[in-house]
């Protein structure tokens, strides 16, 4: 395993119960075999301003906890919630809000989404430009020439101690 990507906060804004302990453990073990720690936040917004504020609040909280420097990349987890999917316009607004908050905090930004979102909801301008972490639970990734994901999540069954 070369790295880990950790959930930062819950919908309430509270830290995930294992987040700080996991970040501390990872930070003390980064070496040539285990090189990075990314953070992700599931979006609960549908417009630019709310997305910007949600991301900025999360990143500020992480900074105050003293672990923002451990963040290799901050990922927006963009999936349907509240009983419906995003529209392309909503997805673009949320991506823009999160991306601008990450840039202001000096943290590289990435996008986590499933293949359906990448193909049908996310504007190609984003999927081609952003560091992409794709979920596709299959034995093969399929044709990804257009958007070239950097990370492929093919299972949700793995675990790591801690």
Describe each region flagged by the PLM.
Residues 1-2, 123-162:
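Functionally critical loop-and-helix segments that line ligand-binding/catalytic clefts
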Residues 19, 40-42, 112, 137, ...:
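Aromatic side chains
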Residues 91, 105-111, 128-136:
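Extracellular glycoside hydrolase catalytic/binding regions
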Residues 1-105:
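Substrate-binding cleft of extracellular glycoside hydrolase catalytic domains
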Residues 87-88, 120-124:
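A short secondary-structure junction signal
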Residues 36, 105-120:
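Aromatic-lined carbohydrate-recognition surfaces of secreted/lumenal glycan-active proteins
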Residues 46, 82, 116, 139-141, ...:
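Residue-level detector of flexible, active-site-proximal loop/helix-junction positions
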Residues 38-40, 75, 110, 133, ...:
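Structural detector of well-ordered beta-strand residues that form the stable sheet scaffold
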């Amino acid at each position: 395993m070369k790295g880990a990507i950790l959930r930062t906060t819950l919908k309430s804004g509270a830290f995930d119960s294992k987040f700080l302990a996991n970040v501390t453990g990872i930070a003390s073990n980064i070496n040539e075999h285990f090189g990075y720690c990314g953070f992700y936040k599931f979006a609960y917004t549908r417009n630019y301003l709310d997305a910007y504020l949600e991301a900025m609040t999360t990143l500020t909280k992480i900074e105050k906890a003293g672990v923002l420097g451990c963040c290799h990349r901050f990922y927006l987890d963009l999936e349907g919630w509240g009983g419906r999917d995003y529209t392309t316009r909503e997805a673009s607004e949320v991506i823009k809000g999160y991306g601008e908050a990450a840039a202001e905090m000096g943290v590289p930004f990435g996008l986590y989404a499933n293949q359906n979102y990448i193909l049908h909801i996310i504007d190609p301008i984003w999927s081609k430009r952003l560091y992409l972490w794709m979920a596709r639970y299959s034995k093969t990734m399929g044709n990804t020439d257009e958007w070239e994901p950097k990370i492929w999540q093919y299972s949700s069954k793995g675990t790591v101690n801690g």
